[in-house]
């Protein structure tokens, strides 16, 4: 059975501001099932942003586990991400989950991959999902050549990804921490 998939999530950190955004499209095979899904959320008393890509059920399962780790480690983003990654690598059921997360707080942005890796992105820019490469390239160009805010860069990057990736639409949700 096919899984729901296809999305773009992008995060940009500039100075003391970070933005995390995603599109709203959920695809099953070659059919758009939903155009306004919310794949970017605020968690842990609105102090942490999280965006997810991959199989929808898998992503929600990982999001729930990440929230529990964040609570257990009193909001320490890095510790929660590493603990989730450890579980992901050692738990047979979790290893089958096909999803990725981008998490960000006031000081740190991390990508948690389907292999159980935790990555600290270079230059404060990261993207995941089917349109991730387009969004990341656009964000990098905008960071290097403009003075736009992280929110504006995320918005424009998602727009470019939506123009190029058939699994990404123009219904955007963007959250920021300043």
Swiss-Prot record:
The keyword Ion transport does not apply. It is found in: Cytoplasm. The active site is at residue 7. GO terms for biological process: proteolysis involved in protein catabolic process. It catalyses: ATP-dependent cleavage of peptide bonds with broad specificity. Allosterically activated by HslU binding. A double ring-shaped homohexamer of HslV is capped on each side by a ring-shaped HslU homohexamer. The assembly of the HslU/HslV complex is dependent on binding of ATP. Belongs to the peptidase T1B family. HslV subfamily. This is ATP-dependent protease subunit HslV.
């Amino acid at each position: 059975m096919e899984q729901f998939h296809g999305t773009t999530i992008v995060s940009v950190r500039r100075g003391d501001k970070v933005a995390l955004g995603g599109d709203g499209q959920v695809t099953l095979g070659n059919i758009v099932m939903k155009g306004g899904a919310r794949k970017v959320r605020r968690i842990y008393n609105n102090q942490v942003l999280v965006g997810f890509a991959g199989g929808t059920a898998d992503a929600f399962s990982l999001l729930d586990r990440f929230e529990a780790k964040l609570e257990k480690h009193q909001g320490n983003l890095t510790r929660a991400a590493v603990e989730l990654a450890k579980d992901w690598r050692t738990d047979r059921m979790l290893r089958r989950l096909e999803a990725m997360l981008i998490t960000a707080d006031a000081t740190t942005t991390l990508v948690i991959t389907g292999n159980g890796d935790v990555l600290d992105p270079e230059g404060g820019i990261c993207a995941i999902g089917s349109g991730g490469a387009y969004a990341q390239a656009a964000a990098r160009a905008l960071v290097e050549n403009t003075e736009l805010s992280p929110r504006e860069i995320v918005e424009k990057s998602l727009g470019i990804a939506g123009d190029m990736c058939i699994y990404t639409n123009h219904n955007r949700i963007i959250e920021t921490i300043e």
